């Protein structure tokens, strides 16, 4: 019976009638290597830092770098803790190291045109940042919680919900 189920699932996946969730785990090395990489990137991405001060919450990001476990990263905390540097700089560089091209979007810009739509293969030049984030392999949003309601021909909705639904549907982190 187990073999029949496996065969059925394989056939349905091949016929594109079924999606099997299979999270992609990423790692940028052991804990020491990730710590060194984090510190190097953080310093390079913010030239205003005179002296780097390692904050306790950075250790959680470094743990995620060691093994993402196929999940994304949600950063919450007080102002001035480095969330935007991590979100808009560090994570895109890390993903770039894994050949994943991403663009971090500020939450205020969800309904604005995606600036690289014309140069992104297959994208309509009128694509919004919201549409980009629903299609991108690893959506990155800075300043979540300040995003405006989206008005689509009179229908108002929260764009973040569309991004989360797409990520869940397609098994994205």
Where are these regions (language model features)?
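AAA+/P-loop NTPase substrate/partner-engagement loops
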Residues: 92-139
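Conserved lysine of the Walker
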Residues: 83
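A short, basic N-terminal segment
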Residues: 1-69
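Short loop/turn elements that form and flank the Walker-type P-loop nucleotide-binding site
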Residues: 68-69, 133-136, 168-171
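Walker A (P-loop) phosphate-binding loop of P-loop NTPases
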Residues: 80
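Hydrophobic anchor at the beta1->P-loop junction of P-loop NTPases
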Residues: 73-75
């Amino acid at each position: 019976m187990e073999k029949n189920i496996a065969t059925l699932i394989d056939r349905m996946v091949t016929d594109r009638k079924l999606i099997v969730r299979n999270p992609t785990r990423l790692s940028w090395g052991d804990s020491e290597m990730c710590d060194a990489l984090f510190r190097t990137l953080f310093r390079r991405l913010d030239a205003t830092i005179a002296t780097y001060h390692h904050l306790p919450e950075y250790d959680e990001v470094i743990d995620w770098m060691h093994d993402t476990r196929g999940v994304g990263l949600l950063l919450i905390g007080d102002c001035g803790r480095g969330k935007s540097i991590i979100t808009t700089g560090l994570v895109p560089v890390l993903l770039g190291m894994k050949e994943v091209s991403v663009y971090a979007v500020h939450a205020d810009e969800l309904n604005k045109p995606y600036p690289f739509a014309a140069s992104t293969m297959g994208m309509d030049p009128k694509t919004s940042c919201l549409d980009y984030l629903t299609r991108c392999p690893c959506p990155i949003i800075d300043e979540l919680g300040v995003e405006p309601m989206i008005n689509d021909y009179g229908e108002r909705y929260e764009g973040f919900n569309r991004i989360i639904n797409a990520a869940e549907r397609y098994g994205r982190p």
